[in-house]
């Protein structure tokens, strides 16, 4: 899926705003403090805010997205989340002076699909009931090992596209995916 001029412009404007914060001198100071902490030479306790209820945070439309392409929509969302956090509660976060682009990595998951029914949905809140697919010991055989694959040609294409979009605004860095391995979080949806 090609990006429109409007989408490219939205990405560029978001990247410019991100880089304004990422280029501030305070970033180097925060990096110094984090490195000291990681070397067991803490200068002061460090604070980071995590586990944000993003579905509740877009009251002022700061997180509205304009890009349809799934890869670059993710880039747009990640940039906007970082900007949002930095504007509202920066504490000791560090903004890297580059734009992260996801490599083309896929994951087969555990070989099962969640079967659910939505009981209640209102705005950003919903309640679900999950079909028990693991009722017996035999059912456990349905769980498969994950298979992780990397499409190098697609990763190269993403890098080229991103480099062109963000040229003169920010360097581009390819990043791997972080796969959530909290097995119980997944298993609870199969039971």
Residue ranges and their predicted role:
Residues 1-191:
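Catalytic cores of TIM-barrel enzymes
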């Amino acid at each position: 899926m090609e990006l429109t001029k409007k989408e490219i412009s939205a990405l560029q404007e978001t990247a410019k705003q991100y880089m304004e914060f990422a280029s501030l001198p305070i970033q180097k100071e925060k990096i110094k403090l984090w490195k000291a902490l990681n070397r067991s030479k803490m200068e002061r306790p460090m604070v980071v805010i995590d586990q944000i209820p993003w579905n509740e945070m877009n009251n002022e439309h700061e997180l509205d997205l304009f890009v349809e392409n799934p890869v670059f929509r993710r880039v747009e969302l990640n940039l906007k989340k970082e900007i949002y956090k930095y504007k509202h509660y920066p504490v000791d976060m560090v903004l890297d002076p580059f734009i992260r682009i996801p490599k083309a990595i896929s994951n087969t998951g555990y070989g099962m699909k969640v079967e659910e029914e939505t009981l209640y949905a209102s705005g950003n809140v919903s309640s679900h009931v999950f079909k028990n697919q693991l009722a017996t010991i035999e059912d456990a055989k349905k769980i498969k090992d994950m298979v992780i694959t990397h499409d190098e040609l697609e990763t190269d294409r993403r890098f080229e596209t991103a480099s062109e979009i963000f040229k003169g605004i920010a360097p581009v860095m390819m990043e791997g995916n972080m796969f959530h391995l909290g097995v119980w979080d997944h298993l609870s949806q199969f039971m």
